[in-house]
Amino acid sequence: MQQQVEPTLKNVLENQTLKWIFVGGKGGVGKTTTSSSLATLFAKSGKRTIIISTDPAHNLSDCFDQKIGSQPTQIKGIENLSAMEIDPTVDPDKLKLPTLQGFMNDQATKSLLSELISSVPGIDEAMSFAELMNSVDEMKYDLIIFDTAPTGHTLRLLNFPNIMEKGLNKLVQLRYNFQNLASQFQGLFGSQEEFDQQMNQMFSKIETMKDTVTKVNAQMKDRNKTTFIGVCIPEFLSMYETERLVQELTKFKIDIHNIVINQVLFPDDQCKMCNARAKMQKKYLDQMIDLYDDFHVVIMPLQENEVRGIDGLKQFCELLLKPKSVPQF
Protein backbone atom coordinates (compact mmCIF):
# COMPACT_ATOMS: atom_id res chain seq x y z
CA MET A 1 0.00 0.00 0.00
CA GLN A 2 1.46 3.34 -1.12
CA GLN A 3 1.88 6.11 1.46
CA GLN A 4 0.55 9.55 0.52
CA VAL A 5 3.09 11.67 2.43
CA GLU A 6 6.82 11.27 2.98
CA PRO A 7 7.40 8.53 5.59
CA THR A 8 10.14 10.36 7.53
CA LEU A 9 10.48 12.95 10.30
CA LYS A 10 12.08 15.53 7.99
CA ASN A 11 8.91 17.62 8.25
CA VAL A 12 9.49 18.01 11.98
CA LEU A 13 13.14 19.01 11.58
CA GLU A 14 12.28 21.54 8.89
CA ASN A 15 9.63 23.26 11.03
CA GLN A 16 11.30 26.45 12.25
CA THR A 17 8.53 27.53 14.63
CA LEU A 18 8.30 24.46 16.88
CA LYS A 19 9.02 24.97 20.58
CA TRP A 20 7.52 21.86 22.25
CA ILE A 21 7.56 18.26 21.02
CA PHE A 22 5.90 15.44 22.96
CA VAL A 23 6.78 11.83 22.14
CA GLY A 24 4.44 9.18 23.52
CA GLY A 25 2.77 5.81 23.16
CA LYS A 26 2.43 2.43 24.81
CA GLY A 27 5.20 1.28 27.17
CA GLY A 28 8.12 -0.58 25.61
CA VAL A 29 7.71 0.58 22.01
CA GLY A 30 10.85 2.72 21.75
CA LYS A 31 9.65 6.16 22.87
CA THR A 32 12.93 7.05 24.58
CA THR A 33 15.05 5.90 21.64
CA THR A 34 12.88 7.88 19.22
CA SER A 35 12.77 11.06 21.33
CA SER A 36 16.51 10.90 22.10
CA SER A 37 17.34 10.48 18.41
CA LEU A 38 15.08 13.38 17.48
CA ALA A 39 16.71 15.55 20.15
CA THR A 40 20.12 14.60 18.74
CA LEU A 41 19.04 15.63 15.23
CA PHE A 42 17.78 19.02 16.41
CA ALA A 43 20.92 19.66 18.46
CA LYS A 44 23.12 18.85 15.48
CA SER A 45 21.10 21.29 13.37
CA GLY A 46 22.18 24.05 15.76
CA LYS A 47 19.11 24.33 17.97
CA ARG A 48 19.69 24.56 21.72
CA THR A 49 17.69 21.50 22.75
CA ILE A 50 16.67 19.82 25.99
CA ILE A 51 14.98 16.44 26.32
CA ILE A 52 12.98 15.81 29.49
CA SER A 53 11.75 12.44 30.72
CA THR A 54 8.45 12.53 32.64
CA ASP A 55 8.25 8.73 32.79
CA PRO A 56 8.70 7.44 36.37
CA ALA A 57 10.72 4.57 34.83
CA HIS A 58 13.44 6.83 33.42
CA ASN A 59 15.52 5.53 30.50
CA LEU A 60 17.42 8.60 29.29
CA SER A 61 20.51 7.74 31.35
CA ASP A 62 20.64 4.29 29.75
CA CYS A 63 19.95 5.64 26.27
CA PHE A 64 22.71 8.27 26.37
CA ASP A 65 24.94 6.01 28.48
CA GLN A 66 25.61 8.69 31.10
CA LYS A 67 24.17 9.77 34.43
CA ILE A 68 21.24 12.18 34.07
CA GLY A 69 19.44 13.72 37.04
CA SER A 70 16.70 16.20 37.90
CA GLN A 71 18.74 19.18 36.69
CA PRO A 72 19.71 19.89 33.04
CA THR A 73 22.73 17.75 32.17
CA GLN A 74 24.90 18.43 29.12
CA ILE A 75 25.08 15.33 26.90
CA LYS A 76 28.68 14.35 26.27
CA GLY A 77 29.67 14.38 22.62
CA ILE A 78 26.60 16.31 21.42
CA GLU A 79 26.82 20.08 21.45
CA ASN A 80 23.59 22.00 22.14
CA LEU A 81 21.89 19.00 23.82
CA SER A 82 20.90 18.72 27.48
CA ALA A 83 18.70 16.20 29.28
CA MET A 84 16.91 15.82 32.59
CA GLU A 85 14.76 13.20 34.32
CA ILE A 86 12.04 14.58 36.56
CA ASP A 87 9.52 13.14 38.98
CA PRO A 88 6.03 14.02 37.68
CA THR A 89 4.63 14.11 41.23
CA VAL A 90 5.26 16.91 43.71
CA ASP A 91 5.82 17.38 47.42
CA PRO A 92 3.62 20.13 48.93
CA ASP A 93 6.75 21.43 50.68
CA LYS A 94 8.28 22.17 47.25
CA LEU A 95 5.40 24.22 45.84
CA LYS A 96 6.81 27.44 47.33
CA LEU A 97 3.41 28.66 48.46
CA PRO A 98 3.52 31.47 51.06
CA THR A 99 3.00 30.31 54.64
CA LEU A 100 0.60 31.81 57.15
CA GLN A 101 3.46 33.25 59.17
CA GLY A 102 2.52 34.52 62.59
CA PHE A 103 -0.76 32.63 62.71
CA MET A 104 0.13 28.97 62.42
CA ASN A 105 3.36 27.11 63.07
CA ASP A 106 5.25 25.59 60.11
CA GLN A 107 3.86 22.11 60.71
CA ALA A 108 0.31 23.40 60.81
CA THR A 109 0.89 25.39 57.63
CA LYS A 110 2.22 22.32 55.84
CA SER A 111 -0.79 20.36 57.02
CA LEU A 112 -3.09 23.07 55.68
CA LEU A 113 -1.37 23.08 52.29
CA SER A 114 -1.41 19.29 52.14
CA GLU A 115 -5.11 19.30 52.97
CA LEU A 116 -5.83 21.88 50.29
CA ILE A 117 -3.85 20.02 47.65
CA SER A 118 -5.05 16.51 48.50
CA SER A 119 -8.67 17.70 48.42
CA VAL A 120 -8.51 17.87 44.61
CA PRO A 121 -7.32 14.63 42.95
CA GLY A 122 -4.59 15.27 40.38
CA ILE A 123 -3.94 18.90 41.28
CA ASP A 124 -0.54 18.08 42.78
CA GLU A 125 0.65 16.75 39.41
CA ALA A 126 -0.95 19.71 37.66
CA MET A 127 0.91 22.17 39.86
CA SER A 128 4.16 20.28 39.39
CA PHE A 129 3.71 20.22 35.62
CA ALA A 130 2.96 23.96 35.60
CA GLU A 131 6.10 24.73 37.58
CA LEU A 132 8.15 22.46 35.30
CA MET A 133 6.87 24.05 32.09
CA ASN A 134 7.39 27.54 33.48
CA SER A 135 10.92 26.74 34.65
CA VAL A 136 11.92 25.12 31.35
CA ASP A 137 10.45 28.02 29.38
CA GLU A 138 12.60 30.43 31.39
CA MET A 139 15.74 28.44 30.50
CA LYS A 140 15.47 29.82 26.96
CA TYR A 141 15.99 26.59 25.06
CA ASP A 142 15.12 26.70 21.37
CA LEU A 143 13.32 23.37 21.62
CA ILE A 144 11.95 21.21 24.44
CA ILE A 145 11.27 17.52 23.79
CA PHE A 146 9.28 15.47 26.30
CA ASP A 147 9.87 11.74 26.54
CA THR A 148 6.52 10.97 28.14
CA ALA A 149 5.22 8.13 30.28
CA PRO A 150 2.91 5.46 28.77
CA THR A 151 -0.30 6.69 27.15
CA GLY A 152 -2.58 6.88 30.22
CA HIS A 153 -0.24 9.14 32.17
CA THR A 154 0.38 11.32 29.13
CA LEU A 155 -3.34 11.88 28.65
CA ARG A 156 -3.59 12.99 32.29
CA LEU A 157 -0.89 15.57 31.60
CA LEU A 158 -2.91 16.93 28.71
CA ASN A 159 -5.96 17.25 30.97
CA PHE A 160 -4.10 19.26 33.63
CA PRO A 161 -5.50 22.68 32.58
CA ASN A 162 -9.03 21.40 33.23
CA ILE A 163 -7.93 19.91 36.55
CA MET A 164 -6.35 23.22 37.56
CA GLU A 165 -9.49 25.18 36.70
CA LYS A 166 -11.76 22.84 38.66
CA GLY A 167 -9.24 22.56 41.48
CA LEU A 168 -8.89 26.29 41.85
CA ASN A 169 -12.64 26.71 42.20
CA LYS A 170 -12.69 24.07 44.94
CA LEU A 171 -9.74 25.66 46.73
CA VAL A 172 -11.51 29.03 46.66
CA GLN A 173 -14.48 27.40 48.37
CA LEU A 174 -12.17 25.93 51.00
CA ARG A 175 -10.61 29.34 51.43
CA TYR A 176 -13.90 30.81 52.66
CA ASN A 177 -14.33 27.85 54.98
CA PHE A 178 -10.96 28.64 56.56
CA GLN A 179 -11.86 32.31 56.80
CA ASN A 180 -15.05 31.43 58.67
CA LEU A 181 -13.01 29.16 60.91
CA ALA A 182 -10.58 31.98 61.60
CA SER A 183 -13.37 34.30 62.68
CA GLN A 184 -14.40 31.75 65.31
CA PHE A 185 -10.86 31.19 66.60
CA GLN A 186 -9.23 34.58 66.27
CA GLY A 187 -7.00 33.88 69.22
CA LEU A 188 -5.33 31.10 67.28
CA PHE A 189 -5.12 32.75 63.85
CA GLY A 190 -4.71 36.39 64.86
CA SER A 191 -6.97 39.16 63.57
CA GLN A 192 -9.36 38.49 60.69
CA GLU A 193 -7.67 41.23 58.63
CA GLU A 194 -4.20 39.76 59.06
CA PHE A 195 -5.43 36.25 58.34
CA ASP A 196 -7.19 37.43 55.16
CA GLN A 197 -3.98 39.10 54.00
CA GLN A 198 -1.99 35.90 54.39
CA MET A 199 -4.68 33.83 52.71
CA ASN A 200 -4.73 36.28 49.80
CA GLN A 201 -0.98 35.83 49.36
CA MET A 202 -1.28 32.06 49.35
CA PHE A 203 -4.16 31.98 46.88
CA SER A 204 -2.47 34.58 44.71
CA LYS A 205 0.28 32.01 44.17
CA ILE A 206 -2.30 29.41 43.19
CA GLU A 207 -3.88 31.88 40.75
CA THR A 208 -0.44 32.53 39.25
CA MET A 209 0.10 28.82 38.75
CA LYS A 210 -3.27 28.57 37.02
CA ASP A 211 -2.24 31.42 34.72
CA THR A 212 0.94 29.50 33.91
CA VAL A 213 -1.03 26.38 33.04
CA THR A 214 -3.41 28.45 30.91
CA LYS A 215 -0.46 29.92 29.00
CA VAL A 216 1.07 26.48 28.52
CA ASN A 217 -2.29 25.13 27.40
CA ALA A 218 -2.53 27.85 24.75
CA GLN A 219 0.95 26.98 23.46
CA MET A 220 0.13 23.27 23.38
CA LYS A 221 -2.89 23.97 21.16
CA ASP A 222 -0.81 26.10 18.79
CA ARG A 223 0.23 23.72 15.98
CA ASN A 224 3.00 26.15 15.00
CA LYS A 225 4.63 25.73 18.41
CA THR A 226 3.67 22.24 19.56
CA THR A 227 3.35 18.80 18.01
CA PHE A 228 2.98 15.27 19.31
CA ILE A 229 4.74 12.26 17.80
CA GLY A 230 3.14 8.89 18.38
CA VAL A 231 5.36 5.82 18.71
CA CYS A 232 4.15 2.23 18.38
CA ILE A 233 5.02 -1.25 17.13
CA PRO A 234 3.03 -3.27 14.54
CA GLU A 235 0.90 -5.20 17.02
CA PHE A 236 -2.79 -4.95 17.94
CA LEU A 237 -2.51 -3.48 21.46
CA SER A 238 0.04 -0.88 20.42
CA MET A 239 -2.01 0.09 17.38
CA TYR A 240 -5.13 0.37 19.57
CA GLU A 241 -3.37 2.67 22.05
CA THR A 242 -2.04 4.79 19.20
CA GLU A 243 -5.56 5.33 17.86
CA ARG A 244 -6.77 6.17 21.38
CA LEU A 245 -3.92 8.68 21.70
CA VAL A 246 -4.69 10.29 18.33
CA GLN A 247 -8.38 10.64 19.21
CA GLU A 248 -7.64 12.18 22.62
CA LEU A 249 -5.09 14.60 21.16
CA THR A 250 -7.62 15.63 18.53
CA LYS A 251 -10.18 16.21 21.30
CA PHE A 252 -7.66 18.40 23.16
CA LYS A 253 -6.86 20.20 19.86
CA ILE A 254 -3.19 19.21 20.02
CA ASP A 255 -1.41 18.61 16.72
CA ILE A 256 -0.27 15.12 15.75
CA HIS A 257 0.67 14.18 12.20
CA ASN A 258 3.68 11.90 12.72
CA ILE A 259 3.73 8.27 13.85
CA VAL A 260 6.87 6.17 14.22
CA ILE A 261 6.42 2.40 13.94
CA ASN A 262 9.38 0.60 15.50
CA GLN A 263 10.62 -3.01 15.42
CA VAL A 264 9.41 -3.74 11.88
CA LEU A 265 10.64 -7.03 10.39
CA PHE A 266 11.50 -7.42 6.70
CA PRO A 267 11.52 -10.64 4.60
CA ASP A 268 14.46 -12.93 5.32
CA ASP A 269 14.96 -16.12 3.30
CA GLN A 270 17.09 -17.56 6.09
CA CYS A 271 14.52 -17.20 8.87
CA LYS A 272 11.07 -18.82 8.57
CA MET A 273 10.04 -17.59 12.02
CA CYS A 274 11.00 -14.02 11.09
CA ASN A 275 8.96 -14.22 7.90
CA ALA A 276 5.92 -15.58 9.73
CA ARG A 277 6.04 -12.72 12.21
CA ALA A 278 6.75 -10.19 9.47
CA LYS A 279 3.58 -11.29 7.66
CA MET A 280 1.61 -10.82 10.88
CA GLN A 281 3.10 -7.34 11.26
CA LYS A 282 2.26 -6.47 7.66
CA LYS A 283 -1.45 -6.81 8.40
CA TYR A 284 -1.21 -4.12 11.07
CA LEU A 285 1.17 -1.98 9.01
CA ASP A 286 -1.30 -1.93 6.12
CA GLN A 287 -4.08 -0.93 8.53
CA MET A 288 -1.96 1.88 9.98
CA ILE A 289 -1.01 3.24 6.55
CA ASP A 290 -4.66 3.14 5.49
CA LEU A 291 -5.97 4.72 8.71
CA TYR A 292 -3.35 7.48 8.82
CA ASP A 293 -3.02 8.21 5.11
CA ASP A 294 -2.48 11.93 5.78
CA PHE A 295 0.18 11.30 8.47
CA HIS A 296 3.92 10.91 8.13
CA VAL A 297 4.15 7.23 9.11
CA VAL A 298 7.80 6.33 9.68
CA ILE A 299 8.68 2.64 9.39
CA MET A 300 11.72 1.69 11.48
CA PRO A 301 13.37 -1.73 10.98
CA LEU A 302 14.02 -3.92 14.00
CA GLN A 303 17.59 -3.21 15.12
CA GLU A 304 20.12 -6.01 15.51
CA ASN A 305 21.52 -4.46 18.68
CA GLU A 306 20.16 -2.39 21.54
CA VAL A 307 20.24 1.31 20.67
CA ARG A 308 22.45 2.80 23.35
CA GLY A 309 25.07 5.52 23.44
CA ILE A 310 25.88 8.23 20.92
CA ASP A 311 26.93 5.87 18.11
CA GLY A 312 23.75 3.81 18.36
CA LEU A 313 21.60 6.93 18.37
CA LYS A 314 23.36 8.34 15.31
CA GLN A 315 22.44 5.23 13.31
CA PHE A 316 18.84 5.44 14.51
CA CYS A 317 18.78 9.14 13.56
CA GLU A 318 19.69 8.29 9.97
CA LEU A 319 16.83 5.79 9.74
CA LEU A 320 14.30 8.38 10.95
CA LEU A 321 15.16 10.45 7.88
CA LYS A 322 15.37 7.58 5.37
CA PRO A 323 12.05 6.63 3.70
CA LYS A 324 11.01 2.98 4.02
CA SER A 325 7.92 1.29 2.65
CA VAL A 326 5.81 -1.50 4.10
CA PRO A 327 7.56 -4.87 3.54
CA GLN A 328 6.23 -6.81 0.55
CA PHE A 329 5.99 -10.61 0.28
Swiss-Prot record:
Q: Which top EC class is given?
A: hydrolase
Cystine bridges: none
Quote the subcellular location field of this record.
Cytoplasm; Endoplasmic reticulum
| GO CC term (a single one) | GET complex
For this UniProt entry, the molecular function terms from Gene Ontology, in alphabetical order, are: ATP binding; ATP hydrolysis activity; metal ion binding
Q: Residues that bind Zn(2+), according to the entry?
A: 271, 274
List the keywords (alphabetical). Answer: ATP-binding, Cytoplasm, Endoplasmic reticulum, Hydrolase, Metal-binding, Nucleotide-binding, Transport, Zinc
CDD domains, A to Z: ArsA (cd02035)
Report residues binding ATP.
26-33, 235, 262
A Pfam family (short name) is: ArsA_ATPase
Q: Which domain of life is it from?
A: Eukaryota
Task: Please cite one Gene Ontology biological process associated with this protein.
Answer: tail-anchored membrane protein insertion into ER membrane
Q: Which residues form the active site?
A: 55
Q: Sorted alphabetically, which PANTHER family does this protein's record hold?
A: ARSENICAL PUMP-DRIVING ATPASE ARSENITE-TRANSLOCATING ATPASE (PTHR10803), ATPASE GET3 (PTHR10803:SF3)
Protein function: ATPase required for the post-translational delivery of tail-anchored (TA) proteins to the endoplasmic reticulum. Recognizes and selectively binds the transmembrane domain of TA proteins in the cytosol. This complex then targets to the endoplasmic reticulum by membrane-bound receptors, where the tail-anchored protein is released for insertion. This process is regulated by ATP binding and hydrolysis. ATP binding drives the homodimer towards the closed dimer state, facilitating recognition of newly synthesized TA membrane proteins. ATP hydrolysis is required for insertion.
Similarity comment: family membership = Belongs to the arsA ATPase family.
Subunit structure, as described in the record = Homodimer.
Q: Which NCBIfam families match?
A: GET3_arsA_TRC40
The protein here is known as ATPase ASNA1 homolog 1
Q: Which organism is it from?
A: Paramecium tetraurelia
